[in-house]
Amino acid sequence: MTTHVTLEDALSNVDLLEELPLPDQQPCIEPPPSSIMYQANFDTNFEDRNAFVTGIARYIEQATVHSSMNEMLEEGHEYAVMLYTWRSCSRAIPQVKCNEQPNRVEIYEKTVEVLEPEVTKLMKFMYFQRKAIERFCSEVKRLCHAERRKDFVSEAYLLTLGKFINMFAVLDELKNMKCSVKNDHSAYKRAAQFLRKMADPQSIQESQNLSMFLANHNRITQCLHQQLEVIPGYEELLADIVNICVDYYENKMYLTPSEKHMLLKVMGFGLYLMDGNVSNIYKLDAKKRINLSKIDKFFKQLQVVPLFGDMQIELARYIKTSAHYEENKSKWTCTQSSISPQYNICEQMVQIRDDHIRFISELARYSNSEVVTGSGLDSQKSDEEYRELFDLALRGLQLLSKWSAHVMEVYSWKLVHPTDKFCNKDCPGTAEEYERATRYNYTSEEKFAFVEVIAMIKGLQVLMGRMESVFNQAIRNTIYAALQDFAQVTLREPLRQAVRKKKNVLISVLQAIRKTICDWEGGREPPNDPCLRGEKDPKGGFDIKVPRRAVGPSSTQACQWSPRALFHPTGGTQGRRGCRSLLYMVRTMLESLIADKSGSKKTLRSSLDGPIVLAIEDFHKQSFFFTHLLNISEALQQCCDLSQLWFREFFLELTMGRRIQFPIEMSMPWILTDHILETKEPSMMEYVLYPLDLYNDSAYYALTKFKKQFLYDEIEAEVNLCFDQFVYKLADQIFAYYKAMAGSVLLDKRFRAECKNYGVIIPYPPSNRYETLLKQRHVQLLGRSIDLNRLITQRISAAMYKSLDQAISRFESEDLTSIVELEWLLEINRLTHRLLCKHMTLDSFDAMFREANHNVSAPYGRITLHVFWELNFDFLPNYCYNGSTNRFVRTAIPFTQEPQRDKPANVQPYYLYGSKPLNIAYSHIYSSYRNFVGPPHFKTICRLLGYQGIAVVMEELLKIVKSLLQGTILQYVKTLIEVMPKICRLPRHEYGSPGILEFFHHQLKDIIEYAELKTDVFQSLREVGNAILFCLLIEQALSQEEVCDLLHAAPFQNILPRVYIKEGERLEVRMKRLEAKYAPLHLVPLIERLGTPQQIAIAREGDLLTKERLCCGLSMFEVILTRIRSYLQDPIWRGPPPTNGVMHVDECVEFHRLWSAMQFVYCIPVGTNEFTAEQCFGDGLNWAGCSIIVLLGQQRRFDLFDFCYHLLKVQRQDGKDEIIKNVPLKKMADRIRKYQILNNEVFAILNKYMKSVETDSSTVEHVRCFQPPIHQSLATTC
């Protein structure tokens, strides 16, 4: 029966699919995320010690002591965490200011309520340190007893005592550092005493003891020192502890950084404890009991080590504060002020890189075969192959530990040695101590070195994590094989000799070892083995088959004892249960065989042959790392842990409450991340996510080790802020990079070459590795999976929109000449968008542009509006047209005020052309377009406005022309017609050109002297002329753009050019071949075959429109002229009907006569310092007059009856040159001739368009027939 699923449920199920992580090819440039699977801890802390019934009883008892001491160490660590993470509560509690304060009881009660649990913890801490000191001293006393001094003490036991010494040093330093602990206890004590909470003497005494304990510095150390000195021979045991630490440190018998630093701290603090009233370390050194010169070398090499968190300790301080230092100062070199080369991380980078490359190469070889090919777990390998993988895993962990320790040691040294304004000029004198220790204490090279090492650590952690299952199998196989080979084969010979020589103690130890770890082939030890009887093997040899299993040592269950149970047959994590107990037992028993102390007169070592001793020592040394490697997952995490780079509780304590938390500028993870972003170093850009992983380390440590939620909350808050800043800066950088790339690509190559010739280099943006970052779809940070590409895409989309908006705003803040620059800004943004779309999903550029242009739903956008605004308020009234250059230039004398424009906002260079050099280069290029408006500008207007925008601008211009022609100009025409002479005949040639000039000057005196003629009248006509010219030039530019479009569209419409043919070739054959070649490009048949009906209709309409546009030759200027003609309906333009019924000859009632008068006026030459009409108004003035004349149909009359033309004809005949009425005749004639040529050009252009209109409007020619003229004599006769 099928289950019914609703549509809502189905849709919700589909939505859930988006949450499924899909595998992708994202480049790995971040550390591994924490596994969501649990990490089992199988450390039983020797709880299974009683299961090892075959072991030596003394060492089982010692394991019991180990167990209890480990528990105490864990408790001590908890108190160390408590002290380190202590934040002052008393500062947050209101203080009682006087005894008369009414709410003081309530304040004290709340104080006690809040602080009592914390003070209880402090009381427990005081009791714990007493108990720990007593326990440590009791162990020392037991081991230093006269009868036990020669007894064997295992290395594990000595190291556990060393860990106690380290614990005391840490706890004492933490107690000294935390003033807030003392303040909180004082506040509690004050409140409790007021409320009489501590009435009984015992409570008062305990409180007093706690006060003294917290107040006295080094109280734990002093108590420990005092109690140790009363123990006879304690210095001998401490010398053993120090020596084992020296030996371990010298032979690198440690794995994690914390183990390394613990060895050094135990050396220093141990020497301090040894040097006192009872013993003298210098005498012990003289007796060769300890080696101070070796310790001095270690301390000189590594002067500062981490103590706890961000607390550090100078190892030389232990030496300086010891009792006998002053008289032996000369023996120490570590106490001298010198910088160890260990802290110069930049010099160490060569070796680190070399180690990294060498190990990565070897690891890659195994990774390719084990992980990539998928053969790692399935294939069976030899012991040698397993051993190689085992060694590889160990070397990898040691390398990671070495690098992590190096980072922490440099960081610790920097914290102890903060910079100042004298060492670093960038460090202000008011900088805080933590700021001087972090923010200003690292050079750029050191920051890059830190980032590179961290990247190596985290990157190698990823690679080793991928091979963890392969390593686990190899480790278990190798350890199993090593243990079985050693127990079943290597120990046979010493067992045979011991049986033969009847060394009972040696036999018992060897048998205990074999019974503890042997996994016999048949389930039990071969009873016929000759070595058990002390006999030699037969001549053919005794065959011992040592099995091979992929398991580690497991715990022994007392209830089901069998040798095979020592090793869990199923392997896996079960195979690691109790490995610590087993390995402890085996190693301790082996150590007892080769130790110099045995508790008897003769050591067991002397009973063994030299080769056997060497074999045991070698195995004992190798097996040290077995415990770590069996838990490789945890070891890998510890070796890569850099969490302490964030913690700063010590420095917060130093601020005494002035700081709740430090800003991100002082935080090391952000300092390193921000340094990469600020320097834009290409080689470091792929490492930028690794410093952010330090927050993961710190958060993990805060939750799992410190177990403090407030620390995690602070880390989370800083991560939120830092990641926002990271995305913001990275997105801006990526946008700026691709914007600069686009600007460089589009920059004119010849311009770049010319700049280079003059020594000016315009650089290309250096190649950067942003592509890898843009592929990051799931960055892991504090347990969140972040789509970095999506966040950057959001920011870049906003930046892209802002860039387009800024380009348009920049155009809006300038005049019309800047439209060429606007187009190039948009082209650069278009190329930027195309480059970015290769790596991210952005909205289409056209959609972004329409949004920035406010043209999504409006019929026209900001660019169209500003073009019209500039035309109306600046271009029409203030520009002069020059027909020779085909350009408009700004007038010499403006008749209107400069329009007020908004200033462009100051933005970053990448919002313009990409960078400062590119901005300067493009500014120089486009400065050549700044001083005129010509064909480049009109073509740009056509491309940016399109048909719709051009139509809007034209419509608005026609409104302006209409208002001028029917308003201002019409009123002036009416006025000027009134002051014109009623009749002005053209004088006869006999008067001569001077007489004619004088005649016209006299007749037109009122027009010449009209005050507003050369200002308002000419200005209004200039605006009309400029509007007409703008429409004409837009028409021409649009035609060129259309032709370009048509040529581009031709191959897709099957419009092919005629081909050249040779003699004898047929044109049809060549054309058919060409058509066949371009047939796949023919769009309409293609869409008709493959498209939808809607697509077919669109394709056909587009094809038809393109062809019709090509064939019709549509003209917009004709329509403009026709519209302007409709504005000239007032009778004043044409005058009253002529009395002769034909035309006005001498009457000055038509516009062309008025224009003749105006032309006479501006043809009069001006003085030296005066501006001519063409300088003030340009050719637009003539275009306005001639256009009106043509549209009124008065051109021929104007050519016949124009005053200036008549004067020019006469002057050409008589050639006279006189000055009439201060007017040079010859100069005036020259000016008339120039304007005549201009007028003829204008008439020719206008007639070309008007004739087509007239031809289209009427096919019948209207001819008026007149009667022939009749002589007067005949007329009277008739």
From Swiss-Prot:
Function according to Swiss-Prot or TrEMBL: Involved in T-cell adhesion and p53/TP53-dependent induction of apoptosis. Does not bind RNA. As component of the WAVE1 complex, required for BDNF-NTRK2 endocytic trafficking and signaling from early endosomes.
Protein name: Cytoplasmic FMR1-interacting protein 2
Record carries keyword Cytoplasm: yes
Subunit structure comment from the entry: Component of the WAVE1 complex composed of ABI2, CYFIP2, BRK1, NCKAP1 and WASF1/WAVE1. Interacts with FMR1, FXR1 and FXR2. Interacts with FMR1 isoform 6; the interaction occurs in a RNA-dependent manner. Interacts with RAC1 (activated form) which causes the complex to dissociate, releasing activated WASF1. The complex can also be activated by NCK1. Interacts with SHANK3; the interaction mediates the association of SHANK3 with the WAVE1 complex. Interacts with TMEM108 (via N-terminus); the interaction associates TMEM108 with the WAVE1 complex.
GO molecular function: small GTPase binding
One Pfam match: FragX_IP
Keywords assigned: Acetylation, Apoptosis, Cell adhesion, Cytoplasm, Disease variant, Epilepsy, Nucleus, Synapse, Synaptosome
Modified residues annotated as N6-acetyllysine in this record: K1062
Similarity remark: Belongs to the CYFIP family.
Species of provenance: Homo sapiens (Human)
Lineage top rank: taxon: Eukaryota
Coiled coil: none
InterPro entries membership: CYRIA/CYRIB_Rac1-bd, Cytoplasmic_FMR1-int
Tissue: Expressed in T-cells. Increased expression is observed in CD4(+) T-lymphocytes from patients with multiple sclerosis (at protein level).
Entry's Gene Ontology cellular component terms: cytoplasm; cytosol; extracellular exosome; membrane; neuron projection; nucleus; perinuclear region of cytoplasm; SCAR complex
